[in-house]
């Protein structure tokens, strides 16, 4: 058994998450974690809501509520959505916990002591009309690197590069469209140049990374500059330095603190299970690999910023230094970044109404239909497009007509003819029977190898190819025509049931909800595919502060079945089956497109009205 760390990108708590988000960080990470657990490995899968920084302030200002109120609301919304999607976190928490603040400040202080954090000045944007500092994400303009419009003051989504507001061309305020002025202010900086040699050397040892990820990551080191890790903002983690700790308008930069969340969540998980040092097996043991799942817009922070923070904390940059009490921290084994998903040919945008939220699609369609579509058509290594027509087609042709129908046919034939799993009669067995069982057993290595190499689309395609071959076997053997030969009929149906069971194991990481139903359709009892749960907890360091976490019980041999062919048992009662998957009516496509157009129009009108009101206020 090996320890496997699965770190999942932290969604901003500034609104509900949409399908484009979970296609990048959510479902792929869960498929991988579920597979590794079935392999017998000890997986720790962590994440949480990212609740500091300007995205929260921007939305809170729009709604006229405090940043904490907004974070509290969307922490609950997001946690429920991700739990409903079946994402099997060991701990999904948040960045406003006392535990997270302590861990972040510990890393800052050690990096400062080691000489990798220093004080300097930086230009900040000021609103001419109010005199207020405008945080990074309140500023938009043209990217100086790729020329894309709509780049933010902290990052360009088009090219993925990190930016400072004063680097933007033609910068304007998102609040009211005015042009900001820039003034020098004091900040702390992370000395990335002093860490670049060690960071790049580590990157060049990486094997098996997606080509786009490793090439982009290495390209970040063509020109490395120090980055400010504090901001003129009143919402965030206090800077743990005398003269700064009590300053209400100086906080740590959200991206310095957010990536530390993987470590702080692991520590919180260990504290909550009553073994405060248990996290070290995943972070201090150099043989333990850590896999980071995200969208491609977060590559910079996981292949440069977070590794640099760890190198600085470990004292492994050009200035040397001591390892902090939490270290030495393991560098990432792999950064698994997906490309972007669009919707009906348009870029996802909540503000513009180009969106389908997780909670909405799960309210109208089965969860595994959603997971299946994300897995089969998601942006694994190239951009992909969510279309309602393809969503319905994949569900109807592949889940309902192929896989679901196969399960029902086999279970129904067994129930009607035997009422239980029939025996496999060697005397009546044929090469055709043995070939099918050999194929399904061999598929574990093939499908598993593809998942391990983060080629989940191919893995799912291979599993569904096996499903197709089982269907062909049923058609070729025609069990409904051999009822007068009980021994042969029993052997065919035993073979089919074993093959279906094997296919269910192969599909379980992708389709955990229906995998449980298939298990029960073949007479299985107990938990086959464990699902996560929400728990309301109290903060470990801030009495009275409560919030929901996602957690679960995922134990091999108890709630997790192995990544292997488990022999079915003759004599197991098989009940009358019920449909596993239902077809979605074809007219749903037009209904969804009409809903999409109506919501798009309404959101555009609302945003235009808001901007007009802001402009009128400014001019008045």
Curated annotation (Swiss-Prot):
Motif ('HIGH' region): 11-21
GO molecular function: ATP binding; metal ion binding; methionine-tRNA ligase activity
Domain of life: Bacteria
Cofactor binding summary note: Binds 1 zinc ion per subunit.
Name of the molecule in the record: Methionine--tRNA ligase
Keywords for this protein: Aminoacyl-tRNA synthetase, ATP-binding, Cytoplasm, Ligase, Metal-binding, Nucleotide-binding, Protein biosynthesis, Zinc
GO BP term, pick one: methionyl-tRNA aminoacylation
Subunit structure: Monomer.
Residue ranges annotated as motif 'KMSKS' region: 347-351
Lineage of origin: Bacteria, Bacillati, Actinomycetota, Actinomycetes, Bifidobacteriales
CDD domains: Anticodon_Ia_Met (cd07957), MetRS_core (cd00814)
Main location: cytoplasm
Keyword Manganese: no
Chain residues that bind Zn(2+): 143, 146, 156, 159
Gene Ontology CC terms: cytosol
Reactions accelerated catalytically: tRNA(Met) + L-methionine + ATP = L-methionyl-tRNA(Met) + AMP + diphosphate
Cofactor: Zn(2+)
């Amino acid at each position: 058994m090996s320890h496997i760390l699965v770190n999942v990108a932290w969604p901003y708590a500034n609104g509900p998450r949409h399908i484009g988000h979970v296609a990048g960080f959510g479902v792929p990470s869960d498929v991988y974690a579920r597979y590794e657990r079935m392999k017998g490995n000890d997986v720790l899968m962590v994440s949480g809501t990212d609740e500091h920084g300007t995205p929260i302030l921007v939305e809170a200002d729009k709604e006229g509520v405090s940043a904490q109120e907004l974070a509290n609301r969307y922490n609950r919304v997001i946690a429920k959505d991700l739990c409903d999607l079946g994402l099997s976190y060991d701990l999904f928490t948040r960045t406003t916990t006392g535990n997270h603040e302590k861990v972040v400040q510990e890393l800052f202080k050690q990096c400062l002591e080691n000489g990798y954090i220093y004080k300097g000045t930086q230009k900040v944007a000021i609103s001419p009309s109010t005199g207020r500092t405008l945080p990074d994400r309140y500023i938009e303009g043209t990217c100086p690197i790729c020329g894309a419009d709509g780049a933010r003051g902290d990052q360009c989504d088009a090219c993925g590069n990190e930016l400072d507001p004063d680097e933007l061309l033609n910068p304007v305020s998102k609040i009211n469209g005015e042009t900001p002025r820039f003034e020098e202010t004091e900040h702390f900086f992370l000395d990335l140049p002093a860490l670049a040699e060690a960071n790049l050397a580590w990157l060049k040892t990486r094997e098996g990374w997606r080509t786009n990820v490793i090439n982009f990551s290495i390209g970040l080191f063509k020109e490395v500059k120090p980055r400010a890790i504090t901001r003129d903002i009143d919402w965030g983690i206090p800077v743990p330095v005398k003269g700064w700790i009590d300053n209400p308008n100086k906080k740590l930069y959200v991206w310095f603190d957010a990536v530390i969340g993987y470590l702080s969540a692991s520590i919180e998980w260990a504290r909550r299970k009553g073994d405060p040092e248990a996290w070290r097996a995943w972070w201090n043991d150099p043989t333990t690999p850590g896999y980071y799942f995200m969208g491609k817009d977060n590559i910079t922070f996981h292949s440069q910023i977070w590794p640099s923070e760890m190198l600085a904390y470990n004292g492994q940059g050009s200035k040397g230094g001591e390892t902090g009490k939490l270290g030495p921290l393991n560098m990432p084994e792999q950064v698994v970044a997906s490309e972007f998903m669009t919707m009906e040919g348009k870029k996802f945008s909540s503000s513009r109404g180009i969106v389908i939220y997780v909670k909405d699609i799960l309210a109208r369609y089965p969860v595994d239909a959603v997971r299946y579509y994300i897995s089969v058509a998601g942006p694994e290594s190239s951009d992909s497009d969510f279309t309602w027509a393809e969503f319905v087609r994949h569900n109807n042709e592949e889940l309902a007509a192929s896989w679901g129908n196969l399960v029902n046919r086999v279970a129904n034939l067994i129930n009607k003819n035997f009422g239980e799993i029939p025996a496999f009669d060697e005397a009546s067995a044929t090469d055709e029977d043995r070939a099918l069982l050999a194929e399904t057993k061999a598929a574990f290595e093939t499908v598993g190898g593809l998942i391990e190499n983060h080629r989940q689309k191919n893995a799912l395609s291979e599993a569904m190819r096996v499903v197709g071959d089982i269907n062909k076997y049923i058609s070729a053997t025609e069990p409904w025509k051999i009822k007068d030969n009980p021994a042969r009929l029993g052997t065919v149906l035993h073979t089919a049931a074993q093959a279906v069971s094997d296919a269910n194991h192969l599909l379980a990481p992708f389709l955990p909800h229906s995998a449980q139903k298939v298990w029960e359709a073949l007479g299985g009892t107990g938990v086959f595919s464990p699902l996560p749960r929400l728990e309301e907890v109290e903060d470990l360091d801030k009495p009275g502060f409560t919030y929901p976490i996602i957690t679960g019980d995922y134990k091999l041999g108890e709630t997790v079945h192995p990544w292997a062919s488990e022999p079915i048992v003759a004599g197991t009662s098989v009940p009358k089956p019920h449909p596993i998957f239902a077809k979605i009516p074809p007219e749903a496509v037009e209904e969804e497109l009409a809903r999409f157009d109506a919501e798009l129009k309404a959101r555009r009108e609302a945003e235009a009205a808001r901007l007009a009101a802001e402009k009128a206020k400014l001019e008045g």
